[in-house]
Amino acid sequence: MPANYAHYRFGKQLLSGMCPNDRRSIQRFRRLYDMGLHGPDIFFYYNPLIKTATGQLGGVFHAQSGQEFFTRVCAQAGSEAGRVYLLGLLGHYCLDSLCHPYVEKKEADGSARHVELESEFDRYLLESDGVVLPHTYDGSAHMRLTRGECVTVALFYPPATPANINACVRNMARATRFLVGKNRKHVRRLLRLTRSPAIEDQLMPEHGDDRWLWMDSEMLVLYNRALKRYPGLLSQLDEHMRTGEPLGQDFAPAFG
């Protein structure tokens, strides 16, 4: 993570800097680009309440360095659809690898819990974008894939199957809609039953708080830095796919 809106917003802002060919491909396969922006996060939604081998793939892939992960997945980007998913996936890595060290630092020093800070940053971005009641924003509309698109995505995440990918995406959309339900007291009560702070903290705060002002501003600096960093990462990926040139130190960090 960051949370879902930050990744989706980040991907939309990247589009203007894409080359014309990539923009045309994204228009053709927009669902793949949009879901690529969420990267391996989709596996966290497979079954959030029970540990499963498929659900744990989210942690497995997030722990891999960019060099390890992208050296492997570039082999799946030969098709137009595969490249479009890769373009979104690179956006996920670019934002995660810059923001996660900061989020983990704030969690370690007791300033904020991991998911709590990410949910607040989503609220901050939505408010900045003119959404009057950010906690009511339903961002699930783009969370969908066709069966064929699930086949494309599964190739990036062995041993996940297309059926696994379909379940992850469908559950992600359901969870997103549930979190913005009109009866927040009922939603909060159900979340508390999980006894998992990471799940409870996904409920976006209704209002900002002074304790977040500095952290939101620092997260925004990292977010903007990631926007500037993306073209260089894409250039390295393209060179790697053309010539086999090893990925450089920019890909050394893990997703986080």
Give the positions of each predicted feature:
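Aromatic-lined, polymer-binding surfaces characteristic
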Residues: G91
